[in-house]
């Protein structure tokens, strides 16, 4: 695992603070960025390199972990990537704030309906949970005794699970837990969906070294969770390359569900009735390895990739499903600016809420409901799976699995050209953009293309080897089959 610094735009100084200076609205853009905001950024560990009064923003150098923590601060409204940078707009004091990804999956009403994952046991297998009880968004979770168990499989004799730190990534599990269960009552900020589930935490990975022994820790953690009756497990861990000993590295063709850890994950699902939600991994932009990592390749586990926020296109880093798998991987995807580690817990939190509604759902039923709620379903691909899940659709299916939603339109294209006029009621702004997934089979993507949201007439010329094209107009989908 690596965590390198990157230039980051943090849009700042709340407009409310500027208005308190008595400035007319037209002069707000000329007001200086509020000093208290800049001081807050510095205290959070960000190194400010530039300040823009027009953008009401500061440019900083921050690691991905620091940027993720900044995103969760009360003064940050949202975080979105902009040409390789991050942008975090200031957070105004609105009622019941949620993070952008929760807005993307349409989960705003879950809190209104009292869906918090209450009574559901959730296991989290990760690197470490350093200082988790001290995080503002997790204090209530610990104070109300929702963290029911902890076990360190890396260093069992360490003791003091939340104050002992062995590596620079020992707070990774803490951040994942925040994405699962975080809620800051002071700012009415909901970070995760399953704020009242019961959690069992397992540390199986050492952040400063990588070896196959960690896969054994993972399997032992699964067995421990199974013995406690845990039926929903989240893990943002994955293994492919980067082992300390090069001979331990996997080869791409081994991402076929045959690894030790993948076989255990598949057994957990098929024989033990556990629903495993696993991040796809962040190797999608690597030259020699673009695939998801094991155990995300296991049949039956719910693998989650990453999209951007505005168009729902695959993030460059998000791991791709190998073409030789007989099933679609990843299964779903949603927004994260900093890695698939923070998409899996979003879907796990959604799953916990569905189990609260219907505790009798099997692992297979729960997984299928989540996939059916994806905006591309049933036309999944190896970039973003069945797409971005829709929480309200999933809720309806959890209550009545016989519901049938309108299927995407399938059209046949003769020759090498295809044209289509977008219906006026197919909205795209705020609901995903216009995206083409150009494929060499029903599921395997050749390339993805993002078009202007103003596009009304689409003219396609068939690519070499292209057999299918998925056209996404927001949440409306058209599947083109080339003849």
Name what the model sees in each region.
Residues 1-89:
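Inhibitory N-terminal propeptides of secreted protease zymogens
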Residues 59, 80, 121-126, 178, ...:
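Structural recognition of the beta-strand scaffold that forms the well-ordered cores
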Residues 69-121, 131-140, 245-247, 259:
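Protease zymogen maturation seam
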Residues 99, 232-234, 356-452:
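C-terminal subdomain of the subtilisin-like protease fold in secreted/lumenal serine endopeptidases
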Residues 109-214, 228-231, 244, 271, ...:
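Subtilisin-like serine protease catalytic core
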Residues 177-180, 202-206, 291, 329-391:
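Hydrolase catalytic cores
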Residues 186, 201-294, 337-344:
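Substrate-binding/access-modulating region of protease and related hydrolase catalytic domains
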Residues 428-438, 453-482:
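Short, aromatic- and glycine-rich surface loops/edge beta-strands on solvent-exposed regions
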